[in-house]
Regions:
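ATP/NTP phosphate-donor binding region
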Residues: 1-76, 86, 90-91, 124
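Catalytic core of DAGKc-family lipid kinases
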Residues: 15, 44, 55, 94-153
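Glycine-rich beta-strand-to-loop/alpha-helix junction loops that act as flexible
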Residues: 20, 79-81, 104-106
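Short beta->alpha junction loops/turns
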Residues: 57-58, 81-82, 118
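Short, conserved beta-strand segments within well-ordered enzyme catalytic domains
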Residues: 75-78, 100-102
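Glycine-rich nucleotide phosphate-binding loop and flanking beta-alpha elements
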Residues: 83-85, 110
């Protein structure tokens, strides 16, 4: 996949969306890990441009997608697993809203994050995304649902 770059300093609004239930509790300190990412991004872009919200259930994604559309969020950081990412992409695509999306892996398998070479280590992750490296992802669709890596029967 071709790599390009974007200047994250030009983003007006960044939203971190994290799923507190992803990862089957593999990361007992998940909120602490995600909060550290939030603090680091906030220190780069400033408090007024950076916000964080948690997903209690996938149904919350409808309201989050609406918020992203209304507030014209430039960059969404998804802290979750493959299921969270897929569900989020499905909702945001329906809004015809396409912010830059980064993945901070906190799921069980994290296949999407692995394919994008995203580290689970906070400092390495922030260093990479702060460089503004963009990797296009091509969505697939089967039985009316979006998929990013694999689909099955």
């Amino acid at each position: 996949m071709p790599l390009t770059r974007v200047d994250i300093e030009k983003f007006n609004k960044v939203l971190i969306v994290y799923n507190q239930n992803s990862g089957k509790q593999l990361f007992a300190n998940m909120f602490a890990r995600v909060n550290e990412i939030y603090k680091r991004i906030k220190s780069i872009l400033g408090a007024k441009r950076t916000d964080i919200i948690d997903i209690k259930k996938f149904a919350d994604l409808d309201d989050i997608a609406e918020r992203i559309y209304v507030e014209q969020v430039d960059w969404v950081i998804i802290a979750g697993g493959d299921g969270t990412i897929r569900a989020f992409i499905e909702k945001i695509k329906k809004k015809k809203c396409f912010p830059y999306i980064s993945v901070f892996p906190t799921g069980t398998v994290n296949l999407v994050a692995k394919e994008l070479l995203m580290s689970e280590e906070k400092k390495k992750w922030v260093k990479r995304v702060s460089k503004g490296i963009v990797t296009p992802v091509y969505l697939g669709r089967t039985n009316g649902h979006v998929f990013l890596t694999v689909t099955g029967i």
